[in-house]
Amino acid sequence: MKPTLFVLAAGMGSRYGGLKQLDGLGPNGETIMDYSIFDAIRGGFGKVVFVIRKDFEADFRTKILSKYENHIPVEVVFQSVDDLPEGFVRPEGRTKPWGTNHAVLMGKAVIREPFAVINADDFYGRDGFRVLGQWLSKADGQNRYCMVGYRVGNTLSESGTVARGICRTDANNYLTGVVERTDIARVDGRITFTGDDGQPTTTDDNTPVSMNMWGFTPDYFRYSEEYFKEFLRANIDNPKAEYYIPLMVNKLITEGTATVEVLDTTAKWFGVTYAADRQGVVDKIRALVDAGDYPAKLC
């Protein structure tokens, strides 16, 4: 059975000033998602599921879903701040979504096969989908997951410093933890970040970082449901608390419930965080098209 691609497309896009998911950046108005789906099809994926918000469903179906009718099966699920387990009610004034792992839970009803999770507004590159598709196509058990580890040198911004989750791995390349680091940049040819002591620290170009590209089997939904209740009991009155994928993954690793293999990729990541980033992404996509990595018109 071919794996499914699960696309997190419900984000607000507030810093960008609009819905990044629907912004046409390619030569013929292609979105970043369009390139991800093109690469996923090349990487052996057999279905795409999008998690979105109900309020932009009409635009999404018109601008996104209609493109894929003859290329790959697609489904849509919805994330709502009111979608909580039995016994829990959204606190008055809570408008912030419950986070990326809450979004993943929305896929439970339609995903029965190994699946990948990606952000809608990140350009992951062909090789990322290749290594992830290969791993998921052979996934046949439970409690064994994976994450594509991007080389930090391939994720830097030309506009300034970035924050990244630097991966700690054991001798067999299994994830032991993700440490958030800030102020990452290339300085005098070396990659530096702010260490625990507040001082600049260097790291190797090939150090793996998490760009939220995960591979799971359906048993992950069960663990996520259980822990979401635990999360809500502790955080429901915190208006800013979010249930993130790394939070869930770290719990599974530290408790010995699951393993997460870190897959290396040569792909270069890029994305749009602020409106000012847009032109740089347009130029990078154009360069990839000119190099023959992608057709001028995807579909």
Locations of regions flagged by a protein language model:
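A C-terminal functional module that forms or caps the active site or interfaces directly
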Residues: 225-258
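A structural signal for short hydrophobic beta-strand segments in well-ordered beta-sheet cores
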Residues: 22, 166-169, 262
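Conserved N-terminal catalytic core of the sugar/cofactor nucleotidyltransferase
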Residues: 1-7, 27-117, 124, 129, ...
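Conserved core of the sugar-phosphate nucleotidyltransferase
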Residues: 126-214, 218
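A phosphate-binding catalytic loop at a beta-strand-loop-alpha-helix junction
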Residues: 4-17
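Active-site metal-binding loops of divalent metal-dependent hydrolases
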Residues: 12, 122, 152
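Hydrophobic packing residues within well-ordered alpha-helices of enzyme cores
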Residues: 60-64, 132, 224, 281
